[in-house]
Amino acid sequence: MIITVGGLAGTGTTTTAELLSEKLGIPFVSSGSIFRAMAEEKGMSVLEFSEFAESNDNIDKEIDKRQAELAKSSENLILEGRLSAYFVEADLKLWLMAPLDVRAQRISQRESKSVDVAKEEIKIREESEALRYLDIHNIDISNLDIYDLMINTDSFDPESITKIILTTLKVI
């Protein structure tokens, strides 16, 4: 079983993917972990590699390629990343969402910054990513038609979200 978990910053994609991995007993790989591995391969810090990636479209393409290869070579896998659903044949494609204020609050707590700073950073990052995804892959990240299940994570705690997904898996 291949599952993709996507969503914007602060929606709980990593938490959800980790819980699903634990409940289902199948591995979980995040696009972030692939990114960190690529930075290490280049002998760069994550920050240095992030700056390098901003001007090098091939980094995004390589992350997508590696996720697709992992999915093809795995019988059971959970892939977490904003674009995972676009590059992987999956049994279930999830999209998690939450209001901007909620996401900013979560990120402010996680990263020890003010809610206002977190909110501004989210807006800048998401605008930049939306343009990059459109430019590099011709993907409109706001079009959610590709997803099988969308969950507003503001409405449920992580355990409840996991139960919703596990229930969905029983009927597909």
Curated annotation (Swiss-Prot):
A molecular function GO annotation: CMP kinase activity
InterPro entries, per the entry: Cyt_kin_arch, Cytidylate_kinase_dom, P-loop_NTPase
Domain of life: Archaea
EC class of the enzyme, as a word: transferase
Stored SUPFAM superfamilies: P-loop containing nucleoside triphosphate hydrolases
Assigned keywords, A-Z: ATP-binding, Cytoplasm, Kinase, Nucleotide-binding, Transferase
Pfam families according to UniProt: Cytidylate_kin2 (PF13189)
Chief site of localization: cytoplasm
Keyword ATP-binding: yes
Coiled coil: none
The EC number(s) this enzyme carries: 2.7.4.25
GO biological process: pyrimidine nucleotide metabolic process
Binding site for ATP: G7, L8, A9, G10, T11, G12, T13, T14, T15
Catalytic reactions on record: CMP + ATP = CDP + ADP; dCMP + ATP = dCDP + ADP
UniProt key word ATP-binding: yes
GO CC entries: cytoplasm
Subcellular location: Cytoplasm
NCBIfam families per the UniProt record, alphabetical: cyt_kin_arch (TIGR02173)
Entry's family note: Belongs to the cytidylate kinase family. Type 2 subfamily.
Protein name: Cytidylate kinase
Organism listed in the record: Methanobrevibacter smithii (strain ATCC 35061 / DSM 861 / OCM 144 / PS)
Gene that this sequence comes from: cmk
